[in-house]
Amino acid sequence: LHYPLRRQRQMCIRDRDKIAHIILNRPEKMNSLPVSFWSDLPRIINEIDYDALARVIVISSTGKHFSAGMDLSVFSNAENARNKENPQTDPGRKKGSFYKGLLKLQETFNCIDNSRIPVLMAIQGGCIGGAVDFASACDMRYCTEDAFFCIQEINIGMTADVGTFPRLPYLLPMGLVKELAFTGRRMFANEANECGLVNNVFSNYEDMMKEVMTIAKEIAKKSPLAVWGSKEAINYTRGRTIEEGLNQIAMWQTGMYNPQVDMKEALSAQIEKKDPEFEAVSYTHLRAHETVLDLVCRLLLE
């Protein structure tokens, strides 16, 4: 795998065993999320999603804390951009610009939801503010005993706005979400585990990463098409009825599933007592500098 982000070493990417490992690497800044992060992360996730060389994404960080959330430079940069792009004094236009900018920030974590690849997050120390938005978008979360989660925005006089509230009520009881949101208190690892926010808690960082990578390797062995279908079906059920969920998976199976391919490979591998080899689900038909829309148009004309 060869992904382009190397700028200022704010994030590193490693790849092994069909696992793309994204590492936040600003320990001296408590891995706060700078301006570049908000465009770099979706670009990287989308690239991994498109080339399909990786079957799982793991996100972790270096240092004592997972992340202190949005870097203060994002706030000042947004204000400067609004003043530069909207020199007019009309408050409606200024607020409209702010609204569009906020939607753009929200897209950063939407890419995790929209990716067909499972995203696992490993958390140590503080997961604060925007990092909670980040974590709530992931498919699975694991943490160390010293981890804590804090909806920090309320403590600085604002409302969390890039993903916490649309997602956290699907992960935690509503009353608990409101308590965390209204008080800004810290939820520590044992409480997060008891409530189901994290899948497991580990005594130290090394044990956590070892187990997370073991789980990622197990997922990577499965049919990428079946994993994709499972993620789509599970995410689709949010806010929908059982009937709607059943209809969605029925449509998926009749449209995507072929028992002569992945099921045949899985059963043969079990009989032969070996790991199955599933074909990747990639966008390899894309030509250089061609978008997905370009590809669709080209195929329609061929």
Question: Model-derived features: where do they sit?
Answer:
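Single conserved hydrophobic/aromatic residue that forms the stacking wall/gate
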Residues: 1-9, 13, 285-302
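Conserved CoA-thioester-binding segment of acyl-CoA-metabolizing enzymes
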Residues: 7-10, 14-62, 283, 287
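Glycine- (often His-adjacent) and acidic-residue-rich active-site loop
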Residues: 61-108, 157, 241
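CoA-thioester-processing core
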Residues: 108-114, 122, 128-182, 195, ...
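C-terminal long alpha-helix characteristic of the crotonase
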Residues: 142-147, 198-247, 260-261, 278-283
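Helix-loop "lid/cap" segments that line or gate small-molecule binding pockets
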Residues: 180, 233, 252-257
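Acidic, divalent-metal-coordinating active-site segment for phosphoryl/phosphodiester hydrolysis
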Residues: 185-191
